[in-house]
């Protein structure tokens, strides 16, 4: 979700990444592959979805394969909830090169998806 937040912010949206079980820091592979295309997410801080329950949102998007199961309902205030499952690159195994390639593939897929979302009137 940090990658999706990076693309959303790059598109000029106010965006926040939050998870049901946030990590302590942004995955360094995600930071690397986003830096490759000129987007700095090194300053992002993983947050819990619970931090946003009292906020109003136009759109809440879940992006991980397991998010639909572990976070089926966002109980905060939002107009639209959408889900698009992407493989979790944190599950990649192999050499650093192989793991980086998985992150690139997921990054590129998320970039296409965020670009498509821009076509909807609620964004």
PLM features per residue range, with description:
Residues 70-123:
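Phosphate-binding/catalytic loops
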Residues 65-68:
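Short glycine-rich anion-binding loops that position phosphate/pyrophosphate groups of nucleotides
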Residues 54-56:
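Alpha-helix C-terminal capping/helix-to-coil transition sites in glycosyltransferase folds
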């Amino acid at each position: 979700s940090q990658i999706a937040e990076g693309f959303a912010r790059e598109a000029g949206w106010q965006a926040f990444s939050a998870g049901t079980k946030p990590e302590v820091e942004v995955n360094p592979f995600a930071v690397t592959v986003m830096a490759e295309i000129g987007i700095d997410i090194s300053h992002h801080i993983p947050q819990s979805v619970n931090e946003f329950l009292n906020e109003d949102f136009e759109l809440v998007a879940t992006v991980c394969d397991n998010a639909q199961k572990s976070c089926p309902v966002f109980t905060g205030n939002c107009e639209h909830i959408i889900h698009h499952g992407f493989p979790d690159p944190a599950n990649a195994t192999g050499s650093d090169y192989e793991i980086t390639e998985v992150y690139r593939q997921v990054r590129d897929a998320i970039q296409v998806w965020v670009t498509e979302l821009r076509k909807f009137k609620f964004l």
